[in-house]
Amino acid sequence: GALYFGYIYYNSHFVNPWQSSSDKAGSASVVDNYSEDVQTAAAAFNLPYEYLMALIQLECSGIRPAGERFEPHVFRRLQAVRDGKRKNYENITPSHLANASDEALRNLATSWGPFQLMGYKCILLDVQIRDIRGDRGVYHGVNWINITYGDRLRRGEYKNCFHMHNTGRTYPRVGLPTTHDPQYVPRGLAGITRYKLNS
């Protein structure tokens, strides 16, 4: 029991060596593909360049164009909102989804762009999905970050911000992180140091 808990604790608080090596190798892609756009957006919203670069590495590994990821559980929740079986999902209400087809909901339940924003986040930004996955994806992603947790980010709450980006909630005061990958937050924090040195 204690050995297992120790492993889980270590894995969620420290970057393991093989992940660290992979992140260092992949950082060149992030710089080559996104550095200029991130510098512009970071300045426009007064957000830390190094955090945004580390987040891009976590979310899309610096690949441009970034991939997409469909989330079936989000799709089911959005269907329930549209069909009147659920009052809301985050800031999405039935009025936002009136007459939306299943294909439209599928796009809203897919993450897009360098920050892998869920399609339904476009509603808050008042943009189209093609905007967050297109040439201005960095700008729209940073705008969403600014609206959602920008004040925390400007205060340097990096641990909370990485956790919020992935889960929608701050880092737990007690217990383990609830990110999809237990290495998500420690890898992000290590990335901040790496990109600060390269800025």
Positions of PLM-derived features:
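Non-catalytic cell-wall polysaccharide-engagement segments
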Residues: 1-16, 27-33, 37, 43-45, ...
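A composition-driven signal for long, intrinsically disordered, charge-rich low-complexity tracts
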Residues: 16-17, 55
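Active-site flanking loop/helix segments enriched in acidic
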Residues: 18-24
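Cell wall/extracellular polymer interaction/catalysis modules
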Residues: 25-33, 37-57, 62-65
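Charged mid-protein connector segments
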Residues: 64-65, 72-88
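Short, solvent-exposed loop/turn and secondary-structure capping segments
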Residues: 65-70, 175-177
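Juxtamembrane/interface motifs at transmembrane-helix termini
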Residues: 70-76, 179-184
